[in-house]
Amino acid sequence: MQTRTNSSRWTQEHNATATQADAWFENYRFHDGESLARLRIHYATLGSPHRNAQGQIDNAVLVIHWTGADGNTLLSKNYMEALFAPGRPLDANRYFLIFPDNVGHGKSSRPSDGLKAAFPKYGYGDMVDLQHRLVTETLGIEHLHAILGMSMGGMNAWQWAEAYPNATDGIMPVVSMPIPISGRNMLWRRMVIDAIRSDPQWNGGNYTSPPQGWLSAFPLMRMMLDGVPHLQVVVPDGPAADRFIAEAQSQAAAVGTRGDKDQGVRTQLCRR
C-alpha cells in the first residue's frame, strides 16, 4: 500500500522533482519474531524511471542514509550539488533515485510513535528486508542499477550484496566495511546508550519526553568520530575547543529533535 504526500522541488535548473511517499506493510514480522500490525516506510524519489525493452525499470539507484539521519538528509543542497546535479555521478536526469527512511528513523515507523520500549527490536537485517520490499513490492523494480550507502547505509549495502546478490549491478559502500562494529565505532555507541539509560528521564524506555542527559556527553563521542590529524587543525587552541564543543552539542540537539536516538543507536549496535 502506498500513499503520497506533497512533493518538494529541487531548485537546480532543469532537474527533477523529489516526491515524498509512504509504503505500508501489514503484519510485518521482524527477524527476532516480534511483529507490528502496520509498519510505515517513508521514502523520497528523485528523477524518473526508465524502462527497457522488456518494460522493466533499469535506472534505479537506492541511496541509504547513516545512523540517526533520514532520506531527506541526502536531499540537502550539499549532497544535491555533489552527487545528483546535472553531470554529477548520480545525475537525477539519468537515474531514478530512491531515498528510504529506515525503520526507526525519519518519518518511518519508530518507537516514539507511541510504543516506545514496547516497539519491536529491529536490526540491520530488518532494514534491508524492508528496503527490498519497498523496491520490489511497492515500486515494482526487479533489478537496481546500484546501491549507495553511507556508514550504516554502507553496511546495509554490503548486506544487500549477500542477501540479494543478483538484485543490483553493484554497491557503493562509503565509510563502511563488511565486518562487525568494533573499536571507536562500538565505543561511541556504547557511550550514547549508557548516557541514555542512566538518565532518569529514560524510565526504562517508557519516557514521557526524550532523555537529554546524553547531550552533555556527545562532544566526547563527536571527537571519537574525527581523526587526530584533523582535530589538530580545527582545534588549535582553547577558543577553538569551546567552539567545537558548542557545535557538537548543537548537532546532538538537532538529532534529538528528529526522534529515537535511544532506540535507534541501541538497535544498530545489537542487531545486524
Where are these regions (language model features)?
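Conserved alpha/beta-hydrolase "nucleophile elbow" surrounding the catalytic nucleophile
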Residues: G149-S151
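Short glycine-enriched nucleophile-adjacent loop
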Residues: G154-P165
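N-terminal cap/lid subdomain of alpha/beta-hydrolase-fold enzymes
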Residues: A44-D113
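Conserved acidic catalytic loop of the alpha/beta-hydrolase fold
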Residues: G125-A146, Q159
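Catalytic-loop region of hydrolases
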Residues: M1-A60
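Alpha/beta-hydrolase-fold enzymes
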Residues: A167-T168, P173-Q251
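Alpha/beta-hydrolase fold catalytic core
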Residues: G238-R272
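Catalytic nucleophile-loop/oxyanion-hole region of alpha/beta-hydrolase
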Residues: G114-D126
